[in-house]
UniProtKB/Swiss-Prot annotation:
Gene: moaA
UniProt: GTP binding residues: R28, R77, T111, K171, R273, V274, R275
Alphabetically ordered keywords of this record: 4Fe-4S, GTP-binding, Iron, Iron-sulfur, Lyase, Metal-binding, Molybdenum cofactor biosynthesis, Nucleotide-binding, S-adenosyl-L-methionine
The protein's name in its UniProt record: GTP 3',8-cyclase
Species for this entry: Brucella canis (strain ATCC 23365 / NCTC 10854 / RM-666)
EC number(s) recorded for this UniProt protein: 4.1.99.22
Pathway as given in its UniProt record: Cofactor biosynthesis; molybdopterin biosynthesis
Residues noted as binding [4Fe-4S] cluster 2 in the record, renumbered to the chain: C268, C271, C285
């Protein structure tokens, strides 16, 4: 058999630093605004999606991600929409995995609704994906269909099974929704921890126009934590995954539970991430409208120098924090664009 020498490991690159001294080491990339679900807190039922001609090609996404990695990004998360509905997405993931093999990237991961996981779990594992987040707000099939408008819970559970069998660590992300799933959060935690999965609870965020009043859905996680503390023994721990969640352990289950609280206790002081949309717009903050058009810089020159300068200029504008509020008087989102465009 022919000997194949391993690729030399790349020396870590100094990260980009924003105006407030925070290192930018985490890039979230929305590869599509399309999704096979229509979760009520995320999308309008009759969404108008971007024309496909406006989307970056997979080759352009690869080039952009690679420049960010050269500039010190160590964690790359693919999001959507639903990333696994993007045509030929595994071609992109397979190409990006070269940065894992070289040592330039610590982690390549994705956030998914789980609907396509049974199909792609094996390929994802082969590409070096070791952890994924699966969005799952309820274990009740009828409520699941209601919140997603037409999703099939059994298909998602099959996908989770496939991912775990492929050796991928699954974390469950659940949006806490008042009078919808608040009573079943303890059951969801027990189920996930019983399968070796962490859980992260998320406050609903005021992004994009939807048919429902978000003030009716909003549930502060401080209240959820207090309710959980009456049933479980919670202990704060310093565990971090590179994201904004603050974690506790639950003695009764032995598992970890995270809280993402953009409304009641924001995570801006340690923000290490920026977001790239499928059209090449870079958002320095989830809760601000300031953006940078990297598609223009990408297509103006085959050289990456101009693109690198555009990224530097954008990072120099990264704000100190977001402006999320729940506008109870006017029922308006703080940010007009939908999460499916920015990348959840």
């Amino acid at each position: 058999m022919r000997n194949v020498q391993a690729q030399p490991l790349v020396s870590p690159t100094e990260p980009m630093i924003d105006p407030f001294g925070r290192a930018v080491t985490y890039l979230r990339v929305s590869v599509t605004d399309r999704c096979d679900f229509r979760c009520t807190y995320c999308m309008a039922e009759h969404m108008t999606f971007l024309p496909k001609k406006d989307l970056l090609t997979l080759e352009e996404l690869d080039r952009l991600c690679s420049v960010f990695i050269e500039k010190g990004v160590r964690k790359l998360r693919l999001t959507g929409g639903e990333p696994l509905v993007r045509k030929n997405i595994m071609h992109l993931i397979g190409n990006l995995s070269r940065h894992l093999k070289s040592g330039a990237l610590d982690e390549l991961t994705l956030t998914t609704n789980g609907s396509q996981l049974a199909r792609f779990a094996g390929e994802l594992a082969d590409c070096g994906v070791r952890r994924i987040n699966v969005s799952l707000d309820t274990l009740n099939p009828e409520k699941f269909r209601t919140i997603t408008r037409w999703g099939d819970l059994s298909r998602v559970l099959e996908g989770i099974d496939a991912a775990q069998k492929a050796g991928i660590h699954v974390k469950i992300n659940a949006v806490a929704l008042k009078d919808f799933n608040d009573a079943e959060i303890p059951e969801l935690i027990r189920w996930a921890h019983g399968r070796g999965m962490d859980v992260t609870l998320i406050e609903t965020m005021p992004m994009g126009e939807i048919e429902f009043d978000r003030t009716d859905q909003y549930l502060p996680l401080s209240q959820v934590r207090a309710d959980l503390a009456s049933q479980f023994t919670l202990a704060d721990i310093p565990y971090r995954t590179g994201g904004p969640a603050r974690y506790v352990t639950i003695s009764e289950t032995g598992g970890r539970l995270g809280f993402i609280t953009p409304m009641t206790h924001n995570f801006c002081e340690s923000c290490n991430r920026v977001r790239l949309t499928c059209t090449g717009m870079l958002y320095m903050c989830l809760g601000q409208n300031d953006d940078a058009d990297l598609r223009k810089a990408l297509r103006e020159s085959e050289s990456d120098e101009h693109l690198s300068q555009a990224i530097d200029e954008a990072i120099s504008r990264k704000p100190k924090g977001h402006d999320f509020i729940i506008d109870r008087e006017h029922n308006r989102p703080s940010v007009a664009r939908h999460m499916s465009l920015t990348g959840g």
